[in-house]
A protein has these predicted regions:
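Beta-propeller fold detector
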Residues: 89, 167-174, 212-219, 262-269, ...
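Serine/threonine-rich low-complexity intrinsically disordered regions
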Residues: 46-80
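Alpha-helical transmembrane segments in eukaryotic/viral proteins
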Residues: 8-40
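Short beta-strand elements that form the blades of beta-propeller/WD-repeat-like
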Residues: 127-133, 187-192, 235-241, 286-291, ...
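Structural motif
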Residues: 137-156, 197-203, 246-253, 296-303, ...
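Blade-level signature of beta-propeller repeat domains, shared across WD40, Kelch, NHL, RCC1
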Residues: 420-425, 434-470
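Repeated scaffold domains used in trafficking and secretory/extracellular systems
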Residues: 110-119, 173-182, 221-229, 271-279, ...
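Short loop/turn segments immediately following beta-strands, especially the blade-tip
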Residues: 376-381
Length: 470
């Protein structure tokens, strides 16, 4: 067979295969149209499948047309009841890891927001990690100068707990450089504070929609908790501060229902200072452990009743839990007054367990490094120094930062008590490290019925990044 005959033969075979392929497609389409509709579905040529995910964001409605899926996103129906949250806190023996986002490690090559002030709050179906972005990404030129607390670019966003604060999964919540958020059982309420220092405004959102506002009443950096607010039987409570950070300021507790403010009370605390309260529900009341940025190395305690009456003082324990602080042996606790003569401070938390108290603190007495949680016998009601448990979460060779509280609702755990949980922020970058940026990741721990070994769940990112070397 000469070369021309070979070419003709190969071409003929190829043409035949093409024709056969076309005929097979025609037969396939004919069978699909004529036969399949009559096969047990009464001539219908589509099928709708509802796929409901454990999210508050969306439900997928998938309509199948032959071999094509048409996906619509439909709003999840509102729950028909509020969370109760009047149960007591569960007694716990230790705290086990719940999640770790590793945001800075991932952000060296991923699209991760520059953040600070992360916190966690839970609905009946999920827990979400909230954070204040700087309107910029890690390892990008816009991360320069993000050590600054307040700017028009800061926003409150959230992801499912454990996810990094990345651009692909984050949900916008509010424009904010100070914030809080909580779920009443039906919808999320978020509060974002933004605007100029002298005339800041807190915008209340409910179900993603702005529903109310609070204007600055003292004209000096209106600010709120930087952790979860607290909802009890459909009414949600939070604490705000307006005034100086290093002397007497003004403090208020607020109550809202479905995003509308229905009550507020001024908290009288002469000689004391309250900022950045970490609050949780316990036996029908809101218990808060806060930050004294003026003089005390002990932490203010605020207990709010549903009618907005309150009791305010200091954590009684004979061990200090703010930073900076002096030696434990030289500290004398007080239930009513600031002690320790230490200015500045850091956001922290505590949990009441009967008369005992779990209290978190940095391991370092002078800087935001390391983190441990102590249980002090009778520390809620007496100046006790008796440590009955201690657990290390971040060792003192690694940076920590803010910390705060939240609880797992009974709808999630199926228990008859509220599980106490806390998160620890791990700040990286400026001012302690040679970078152009400041950001953080977090570790989240929840109470369990077992003792947990000490370990260090530190941030672990290797700095500086490429952007810092330019």
């Amino acid at each position: 067979m000469n070369p021309n005959q070979k070419i003709i033969t190969i071409g003929s075979i190829s043409l035949g295969l093409v024709v056969l392929n076309i005929l097979l497609h025609i037969v396939s389409i004919t069978i699909t149209v004529l036969v399949l509709p009559g096969n047990g579905n009464n001539g219908s040529c589509n099928e709708t499948v509802i796929r409901e995910y454990n999210e508050t964001v969306r439900v997928e409605k998938v309509t199948q047309w032959h071999n094509t899926n048409v996906i619509e996103y439909i709003e999840r129906p509102e729950s028909d009841h509020f969370m109760n949250n009047t149960e007591p806190l569960c007694d716990v023996k230790g705290f086990a890891p719940f999640s770790k986002d590793n945001g800075i490690r991932i952000g060296s090559r991923g699209h991760v927001f520059v953040i600070r002030e992360p916190f966690v709050s839970c609905s009946p179906t999920e827990c979400r990690a909230f954070f204040l972005t700087q309107g910029s990404l890690l390892n990008d030129k816009h991360s320069n100068g993000t050590v600054k607390d307040r700017s028009p670019y800061r926003t409150l966003m959230s992801v499912e707990v454990g996810q990094s604060p990345n651009v692909y999964q984050a949900r916008f919540e509010a424009v904010a450089w100070s914030a809080t958020a909580c779920h009443d059982g039906k919808r999320w309420m978020t509060i974002g504070v933004t605007g100029p220092d002298a005339k800041a405004v807190a915008v209340v959102h409910y179900g993603g929609i702005p529903t109310d506002v609070i204007n600055s009443w003292a004209g000096d950096i209106l600010r709120t908790q930087e952790s979860s607010c607290t909802c009890i039987q459909g009414e949600c409570y939070w604490v705000m501060t307006d005034g100086p950070a290093n002397r007497q300021a003004q403090y208020k507790a607020f109550k809202a229902k479905q995003g509308k403010i229905i009550g507020q009370t001024e908290i009288s605390f002469n000689g004391g200072h309250i900022e950045e309260c970490s609050c949780y529900p316990n036996e029908g009341k809101v218990e808060c452990v806060c930050r004294d940025n003026w003089t005390g190395a002990n932490r203010p305690v605020l207990v709010i009743s549903p009618d907005l009456s309150y009791r305010v003082g200091y954590l009684c324990a004979g061990l200090p839990s703010d930073t900076p602080r002096g030696e434990d042996s030289q500290f004398t606790g007080s239930c009513t007054s600031p002690m320790g003569n230490q200015g500045y401070g850091v956001k922290g938390f505590g949990f009441r367990q009967g008369n005992d108290v779990w209290m978190g603190r940095t391991i370092s007495r002078t800087s935001r490094s390391g983190f441990e949680i102590l249980k002090v016998r009778n520390g809620w009601v007496q100046n006790s120094k008796e440590q009955i448990k201690k657990q290390v979460v971040v060792d003192n060779l690694n940076w920590s930062g803010y910390s705060g509280s939240f609880t797992l609702p009974v709808e999630l755990t199926k228990r008859n008590c509220l599980v106490p949980c806390f998160w620890v922020e791990m700040i990286r970058g400026k001012p302690e490290e040679k970078t152009i940026w400041t950001s953080s990741s977090s570790i989240v721990m929840c109470g369990v019925d077992h003792e947990i070994a000490d370990w260090s769940w530190h941030d672990g990112a290797i700095l500086p990044f490429d952007i810092d070397k330019m």
